[in-house]
Amino acid sequence: MNSTPRTVLAVITACALLASLSAQPAPSTISHWQRASETPIVSPQGEAWESAGTFNPAVALFHGKFVMLYRAQDRAGTSRLGYAESTDGIHFQRTLAPALSPLTPYERGGGIEDPRLVQFGDTYYLTYTAYNKKDAQLCLASSRDLVHWQRLGVILPAYKGKWNVGWTKSGAIVPEKIGGKYWMYFLGTSADKTDQMGLAYSTDLVHWTEALDTPVLPVRPGKFDARVAEPGPAPILTNDGIVLIYNGADDKLVYRTGYAIFDRKDPRHLIARSSDPIFAPEKDWEKTGQVPNVVFVEGAVPQGDRYLFYYGGADKYVGVAQAEVSGATASTAPHK
């Protein structure tokens, strides 16, 4: 009875090792990474829906404004999405009420977590994790103004994957069609209990099919991503390929930032991967919070020859960093 799980685990482990060995070290596509603010730009406040944590944000440009959707958590552990605006990308003004609160059976209890944004035409698509205290599942919503949202439901159900046998989370959608399909990197849990990155495709953004029988970006023993390899914001399209910022956790669950480059004509093909992290928790507010020692990038906005990268610090605060991205093309992030 126990031979099948061991066989599956052996196959997944072998495929992961082969994928890691075949990828080359990443070129200097991303350089001069540094904090754009030494202190948090959004912090918990009040006694209600955002009292325990404000973290893991998605950000888009809309009519000249920076619009942030961030995960807000109350002291009971329920998450909602807060809304904030800025003219400079650093100083944000928040609304009094959340933008999205748990309503559906698959959201009630734990709530709505970890947003990521991508734009196609005049429509913004929001991937988020719905958690009902039992299952975490990847969901989708759409909007034309980033204020009024239409839920489109669960797009990758938990426990029904190929290699991923648990929850589904963290959908980072490539911001252009490739081969007539939409492509999305996501987080799944493999048979060995590690959280690894998968890939799915769709023709309508609502119905998704896994593209591979194994993780597209596996964890690497002994590295900064030994336990977790989780997508960050929507990938950036560059001359080098599809650049995906991702969040890696080591065996001590310290979260750091890396990046991977996939073939622009074939999102399944990993070209290169950073050997070492490009960003790590250093500030006190990145080391101490609801979860210690975490920097977790989820938002990216182009600004001239650089990008602003928005991240969660210790599952409690929002921070912002900046870096240069060489060879980035025009349609690389949500904008209008």
Predicted segments, located by residue:
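Beta-rich carbohydrate-recognition and catalytic domains
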Residues: 21-110, 118-227, 236-293, 304-336
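Bacterial N-terminal signal peptides
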Residues: 9-20
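Bacterial N-terminal signal peptides that target proteins for export
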Residues: 1-11
